[in-house]
């Protein structure tokens, strides 16, 4: 589990909009887990890691 989110690693994702996940590794996303990822990011399920001081994450950049 990410300490900043209710997402379980490799689990399904239903994070709230206020979620501050730093490393979302959900296999399915009902919405974006990372604030830096767009909701429709098709690669979110592949393991999104938000970059510090950036509005983009490693999978959707």
Curated annotation (Swiss-Prot):
SUPFAM superfamilies, per database record: Metallothionein
Residue ranges of the region described as Beta: 1-29
Residues annotated for a divalent metal cation 7 binding in this entry: 50, 57, 59-60
MF-aspect GO terms: zinc ion binding
Gene Ontology CC: cytoplasm; nucleus
Residue sites binding a divalent metal cation 6 per the record: 37, 41, 44, 60
List of residues that carry Phosphoserine: 58
Residue runs in coiled coils: none
PROSITE patterns: METALLOTHIONEIN_VRT
Binding-site residues, a divalent metal cation 1: 5, 7, 21, 24
One example of a Gene Ontology biological process annotation: detoxification of copper ion
Residues the entry annotates as binding a divalent metal cation 4: 33-34, 44, 48
Residues binding a divalent metal cation 5: 34, 36-37, 50
Keywords: Acetylation, Metal-binding, Metal-thiolate cluster, Phosphoprotein
Binding site for a divalent metal cation 2: 7, 13, 15, 26
Modified residues (N-acetylmethionine): 1
Recorded family membership: Belongs to the metallothionein superfamily. Type 1 family.
Stated role: Metallothioneins have a high content of cysteine residues that bind various heavy metals; these proteins are transcriptionally regulated by both heavy metals and glucocorticoids.
Descriptive protein name: Metallothionein-2
Gene that this polypeptide is encoded by: MT2
């Amino acid at each position: 589990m990410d300490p900043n989110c209710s997402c379980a690693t490799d689990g399904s994702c239903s994070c709230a909009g206020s979620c501050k996940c730093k490393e979302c590794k959900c296999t399915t996303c009902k919405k974006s887990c990372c604030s830096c990822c767009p909701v429709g990011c098709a690669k979110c399920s592949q393991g999104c890691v938000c970059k510090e001081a950036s509005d983009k994450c490693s999978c959707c950049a």
